Amino acid sequence: MMRIKQLLAMAIMLAVSTTMSAQDKLFTLEDLNYGGNNYANLRPKNMWLTWWGDKLVNTDVEACYLIDKKTGEKTVLFTLDDINTWAESNDEKYVRHLMNASFPYPDQPLVQLGNRKAVILVDFEAKKMVWQDSISGQNAYDWSKDSRATAYVEDNQLFVADGKGKKHQLSTDGSREIVYGQSVHRNEFGIDKGTFWSPDGQKLAFYRMDQSMVTDYPQVDIFPRNASYEPDKYPMAGMTSHKVTVGVYDLNTEKTIYLQAGDPTDRYFTNIAWSPDSKTIYMFELNRGQNDCRLVSYNATTGEKIAELYRETSDKYVEPLHPIEFLPWDATKFVMQSQKDGYNHLYLFDKNGKELKQLTKGPWVVMKLVGFNQKQKSIIIKANKEHPLHHRLYSVNMKGEIKQLETVDGVHNAKLSASGSFLVDEYVTPTRPRVIDIVDISHLSPLTSHLLEAEDPWAGYQQPIFECGSIKAADGVTDLFYRMVKPHDFNPNKKYPTVVYVYGGPHANNVQASWHWASRPWETYMSQKGYIVFILDNRGSQYRGRDFEQATFHQLGQIEMQDQMKGVEYLRTLPYVDMDHLGVHGWSFGGFMTISLMTNYPDVFKVGVAGGPVIDWKWYEVMYGERYMGTPENNPEGYAKTSLISKAKNLKGKLQIITGYNDNTVVPQHCLSFLDACIKAGTQPDFFAYPGEEHNMRGHASVHLHERITQYFEDYLK
């Protein structure tokens, strides 16, 4: 009996010890960082979902399942073995998983799948492959479900293969200087591709970019025995830019015409759209100064200009990001997005350019037009109508009446079914890492079915304390939102070294009502090391309206620094923040902000780590740089004020600068020029370059990067 009691006591002690050990488990960067060996195991559980018409399909590795939208029950639709058997797969056609399965035809049992060598279309009721296309060696692959024709780039030339596989070569002069069928204008203005199929699949609009006149930036590949010269075309602010034209290829006539848009010099063509009848092409045309934007229509057969439908000007800039979208139930009307009233909203036009109605309005932003509900004649949108940090889903009818489609605060993303009657609502909240609901929006009141509630994948680890709040901007009026990450055993009576993490630039914000208030995993790692991390979204960041973003116009970094210093003032009021041990870190625009803060407020920040930093905007690219700063010729004071070269002499604290050796976004000239200025000024920054890496470190190099950043603060801030 005594022996049994002893064993029981030992078992209890072991269980308690194991529980404590599990609760005390520490993160490593292999756990937290993208590219880490254990990163995938600490992600919230997910389901990969897609629509087959109005039927919901779960695409998994080994099988695709049909999901009952009310109960969530799963029925096998087909398996991976089925697909490879029906397709009589060889090495080229062999499908390795079903995660990327898509169902392009709402009323047909056809699934499209692919690998790096081929794309196939399989009839899973007839159990046979009905179409295939070899894609080995191809880039910019674009498939039309209507004609089953494909567009692609091979050896710099643009090709189209029709639905029967007949190959048509559209270009012969393609090169690194003459680029066909790929994204242009350095992916600005919402551009992410270079080919655009007409709705009937019989015509292909495509970009042709002549960048022969653009200066080469001298990148070097150091990995061969003899390092090789691999230049990038990089148009810097105020310098000669490329010229873009838009071609249209007709499958029936096998002829190409070009839109008669006039001289493309110093102009941007973006947001290409088709009319529902495939006869007309629409695009936004923007001047180089980016303050005069026009929506223009063209005859898709002749290339002739039809009409200028809309014009928007600004004393700062206009930034078109979205193509127009025609109403599925009325081909004579389209919806356009614009910030012309101060916030991004939807406007209804007729096809001749007459504005019929502003469909959404108010001091909030339409973040995405998700799609259309044809039965209710409504538009499904994502917007921050309730609060700047919450991204919610709404339905908007043609009268401008808005109805909310879900009931939970947080950050929502939607996938809409073919008819628009159902949507997959995947959302997160500060305390819920992933939830997936199915919403039936065909009723007067939306009906919701619950599909997934992911458990906390970090359970059992030492988790920090995540907080969110707001302070006033430097203007004394505007609310700015912050996130603070504290050690898990935070003691308000102690003082903690604190790091300000900053981005601060356009088209990004760091604080949202998502899991952990959108905290980056590195912040958790730093809190585990005993730091507080503070993140503030200053004026200039996204989703707060036009005036909030454009407050930084022609003076990047200045208003942003004023707001960040308001954050520092707030930190100074907190007794647990050690103001003698304050650091700052950021990447890209955040790297620019880091060095700006270190050199404009040298007595405030003790340590900084700046990654991929812009040093002088005259070395940045034309499209982004000139939108916010103008050119060095028309805004010399702004360029001089924001340049960090003249501020190298102000550096007092420890500063580490990190760059990808082959960065083609913020080219190494920035970092190297600042180092040269520091040499001349007698200041001593540290420098580290990642060979072969571009603007962001990929794969496991990212783990190394974040260990280096962390160690720098460990060495000099504590």
Region locations from a protein language model:
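Serine-hydrolase catalytic core recognition
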Residues: 216, 273, 278, 413-718
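Sterically constrained small-residue positions within well-ordered secondary structures
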Residues: 13, 40, 149, 237-239, ...
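A general structural-boundary detector
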Residues: 9-10, 20, 88, 134, ...
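Bacterial Sec-dependent N-terminal signal peptides
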Residues: 1-25
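Beta-propeller folds
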Residues: 22-405, 409-410, 421-422, 432
